[in-house]
Amino acid sequence: MKLRFLVPCLALALFSIAAHAQDNPSPVNPSTASYIDVGPGDVGLYVNPVGIHITNSQPDTGPFAFLGDNTTARWFWGANIGGYVNFYHHPKYDAGIDLRDSIVSGNNARLNSFLVGGRIVAKPIAEKFKPYAQLSIGLGSSKPPHSTVHLNRFEYGIYGGLDYTLAKHVDFRAIELGYGSVSTVSSGNFNGTTSFPNSRLFSISGGLVFRVP
């Protein structure tokens, strides 16, 4: 399945999970005050700008050099398209899943990352600030600047951020920082004699999150 088809699948999966939880709510246990349910504001959707600083300790050359000839670091820019569902609720935090498709490019190279992960968000601090963290895994598809080939490899990412409530259904994502790793395309994948380590991904993002329903 091509990654471009995963975006509508992402939205469908989120709404399916939310609908199932709403149809099958768990009663609140007074002794623990923890419960599973999806209520108003527990589903969030976002399309936010992102910058990813991609580094690799081993320089590469030729048409399959992902970062460019003899280059070990480069900024890539693009967008995070995704959403989350918080379905587990505790007096001190909420937890759920986040699905995202991160599409970035730089120097005519491209990285497309489809990630699924668990997230935990603290109850609002000072009523409106909501710090969160998540661990995601998935598939990273990289394309070098001078070739049409794509390499699909396992990718992981660790993220932390801060959302601020602007309105009933709108949050401002003040910042999200991330660190991840993926094996990007290189000359070593095409009969090259040099092996290349995974590329490291340092990301920064922000924008708006629309909470539904």
Language model segments and positions:
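Strand-connecting loop/turn motifs
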Residues: 38-42, 49, 90-94, 126-130, ...
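Predominantly the C-terminal beta-signal and adjacent terminal strand-loop region
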Residues: 24, 56-58, 166-213
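Transmembrane beta-barrel strands of outer-membrane/channel proteins
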Residues: 43-53, 97-103, 133-139, 162, ...
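Bacterial N-terminal signal peptides that target proteins for export
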Residues: 1-7
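Outer-membrane beta-barrel translocator domains and adjoining extracellular loop/strand segments
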Residues: 56-65, 108-114, 143-152, 184-192
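Gram-negative (and chloroplast) outer-membrane scaffold detector with strong preference
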Residues: 79-147, 151-156, 205-213
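Short glycine/proline- and aromatic-enriched beta-strand/turn motifs that initiate or cap beta-hairpins
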Residues: 20-88, 101-103, 203-213
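Bacterial N-terminal signal peptides
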Residues: 8-16
